């Protein structure tokens, strides 16, 4: 069992949520508001199971106009750096080479670079996997993630500049 807390504004809200759940289910807290981002030091020590950066809601709550801006301006990297050692994620996954308007490979690269341990499937996944074998596609995604991890460790490669260009 899992239960998610969306749009948390404060660590107090997260504490109340965790108290209500009382370990009867795994918890996912979505980081989707600037106010929770400002409280990461207190947030990271709470007893949640997973955190997920909701790029779309974070964009709206921050008054931005581009979903990728949180990646290009360093916000996502800042959040991830505060969550090291915990299970967290951002962005969505789909078949390798798929995805609109950003191909999944670029997002996967950033996810690996920033140490995420979870992802959700993108809206495009449903359509892109229709005529494909799901097991095969998942294996390709895992293999690509492993290869990217090796490249990043060896070369310290980054697509950060690409996301900066996309927000313009």
Q: Predicted regions span which residues?
A:
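Non-cysteine beta-strand/loop elements that form the S-adenosyl-L-methionine
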Residues: 6, 49-57, 121
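Acidic (Asp/Glu)-rich catalytic clusters
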Residues: 18-22, 42-47, 81-85, 111-113
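Conserved active-site loop/cleft motifs that coordinate metal ions or position small ligands
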Residues: 89-91, 118-123
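Short beta-strand/loop segments at the ligand-binding rim of alpha/beta enzyme cores
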Residues: 21-32, 82-97
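C-terminal helical cap(s) of enzyme catalytic domains, especially alpha/beta-barrels
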Residues: 17, 63-73, 110-112, 125-168
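Catalytic cores of alpha/beta
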Residues: 1, 13, 34-47, 94-117
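A short, flexible beta-alpha/helix-coil linker loop
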Residues: 57-60, 95
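Active-site-adjacent beta->alpha loops and helix N-cap segments on the catalytic face
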Residues: 5-25, 35-41, 60-80, 100, ...
